């Protein structure tokens, strides 16, 4: 939400973020929450606090069933620590991977950069972060009883797709990039709605969604 993460504004502390978001969520009965990327841990936390009727993770790590959850994986933390300036301030997220073209392509930054106006608008909504912000963690209450689904937008999250299938979640594969929600919002919305229908129906079967079949993407090979 741009009003919460405006450029040059530090977001709430990681451990306080889900509580902060509660103030901006319109109360509704058993909502289904959607979290992209690192927000996967936030929706798991919110799913218990609300409580939620279900959650969908889009191209993010699947949080532990309970216990400590950090903003990023340790390997990424090491990468970004080296990019902090003398005061510990990081460049905006989209510039973390400027020297890694392969990673930038998996994220979709190369495609976004083809439109300088769109890139500038995108970066203007990104917060300026201090490296110490990423040292925080949240303690998740047990949430694995909440119905959940997973949308894989990029190959970055092959491991998360495998974990979702192991847990018996419905999974959609979009064959895009990490920024698929930004670059292809209609396609992403279709996949979300397809999973919502499955969660509403209470189907516990592990399967690929209609969104995956319609785009001719890979099938479940388990």
Identify what each model region corresponds to:
Residues 2, 58, 151:
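The conserved SAM/SAH-binding core of class I Rossmann-like methyltransferase domains
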Residues 3-32, 69-78:
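Active-site loop/oxyanion-hole signature of alpha/beta-hydrolase fold enzymes
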Residues 4-7, 60, 176:
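Active-site loop/turn elements of alpha/beta-hydrolase fold enzymes
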Residues 30-66:
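Conserved hydrolase catalytic core segment
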Residues 52, 56-93:
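Flexible "cap/lid" loop of the alpha/beta hydrolase fold
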Residues 92-142:
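Conserved alpha/beta-hydrolase catalytic His-Asp/Glu region
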Residues 126-186, 199:
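Conserved serine/cysteine hydrolase catalytic core
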Residues 176-222:
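Catalytic active-site module of serine/aspartate enzymes centered on a nucleophile-bearing elbow/loop
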């Amino acid at each position: 939400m741009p009003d919460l993460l405006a450029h040059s504004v530090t977001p709430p502390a990681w451990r306080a973020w889900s509580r902060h978001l509660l103030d901006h969520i319109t109360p509704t009965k058993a909502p289904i929450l959607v979290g992209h990327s690192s927000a996967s841990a936030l929706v798991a936390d919110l799913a218990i606090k609300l409580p939620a009727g279900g959650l969908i993770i889009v191209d993010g790590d699947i949080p532990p069933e309970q216990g400590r959850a950090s903003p990023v994986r340790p390997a990424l933390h090491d990468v970004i620590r080296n990019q902090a300036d003398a005061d510990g301030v990081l460049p905006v997220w989209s510039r973390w991977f400027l020297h890694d073209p392969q990673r930038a392509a998996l994220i979709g930054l190369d495609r976004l950069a083809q439109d300088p106006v769109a890139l500038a608008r995108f970066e203007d909504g990104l917060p300026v972060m201090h490296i110490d912000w990423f040292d925080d963690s949240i303690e998740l209450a047990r949430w694995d009883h909440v119905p959940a689904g997973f949308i894989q937008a990029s190959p970055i999250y092959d491991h998360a797709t495998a974990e979702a299938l192991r847990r018996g979640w419905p999974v959609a594969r979009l064959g895009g990039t990490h920024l698929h929600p930004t670059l292809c919002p209609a396609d992403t919305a279709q996949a979300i709605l397809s999973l919502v229908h499955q969660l509403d129906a209470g189907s516990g079967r592990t399967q690929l969604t209609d969104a995956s079949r319609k785009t001719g993407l890979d099938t479940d090979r388990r």
